[in-house]
């Protein structure tokens, strides 16, 4: 005799079960994604603060040890490259240095921005770096205000939230970016900005 299969022994998930699983995954993503952005911002900003410390320490060595061999205790305003003398990458004024001569590593070279906005070839952890235009070099006998470096994010509130600056006083300063989300940063931290808190 012929029997009909009523489908009662079929296996699989019902539409309700699938919707519940999708809902749970959606809730988990809604909680996790903002935390991932915060972690990314924190990592980029920590890396940039370290870069500011490296520039500060490099400038101090350049000054104290007269690494450009010009007989003057002065700073440099250039990151440069391994063949350009009188820079943080190649302190001796003659140029043609080795990595051992360098005060900063090669990742600084592509991170240099020369305009008003953070636009560089190879950002360092989402940030561009530039020599501060508000440096006061009127008194060559003091350490105060002889150099300054700034860092700003390439995409505001996507790669970071704060801009950074460091001057001859050695204090790393921060300013919360006021740029529109996604716009390049405008190097808003300066010598009047508050010191960064940990």
Model-derived regions, located:
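Alpha-helical hydrophobic helix detector
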Residues: 19-35
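Extracellular/periplasmic head regions of type IV pilus-like filament subunits
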Residues: 57-162, 168-169, 176, 194-198
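A short, surface-exposed interaction/processing loop segment used at functional sites
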Residues: 166-189
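Secretory/exported precursors with cleavable N-terminal leaders
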Residues: 12-20
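Aliphatic-rich helix starts adjacent to a transmembrane/signal segment
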Residues: 35-52
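N-terminal leader/signal peptides at the extreme start of proteins
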Residues: 1-13
């Amino acid at each position: 005799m012929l029997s009909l299969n009523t489908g009662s022994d079929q296996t699989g998930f019902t539409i309700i079960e699938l919707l519940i699983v999708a809902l749970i995954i959606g809730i988990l993503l809604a909680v996790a994604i903002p935390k991932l952005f915060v972690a990314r911002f924190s990592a980029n900003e920590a890396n940039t603060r370290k870069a500011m410390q490296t520039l500060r320490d490099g400038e101090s060595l350049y000054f104290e040890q007269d690494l450009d061999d010009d007989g003057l205790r002065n700073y440099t305003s250039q990151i440069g490259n391994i063949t350009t003398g009188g820079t943080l990458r190649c302190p001796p004024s003659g140029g043609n240095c080795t990595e051992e001569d360098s005060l900063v590593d090669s990742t600084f070279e592509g991170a240099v921005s020369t305009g008003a906005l953070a636009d560089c070839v190879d950002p360092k952890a989402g940030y561009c770096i530039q020599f501060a235009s508000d440096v006061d070099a009127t008194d060559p006998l003091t350490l105060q205000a002889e150099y300054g470096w700034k860092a700003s994010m390439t995409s505001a509130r996507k790669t970071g939230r704060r801009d950074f600056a460091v001057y001859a006083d050695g204090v790393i300063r921060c300013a919360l970016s006021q740029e529109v989300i996604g716009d390049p940063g405008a190097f808003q931290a300066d010598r009047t900005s508050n010191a960064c808190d940990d």
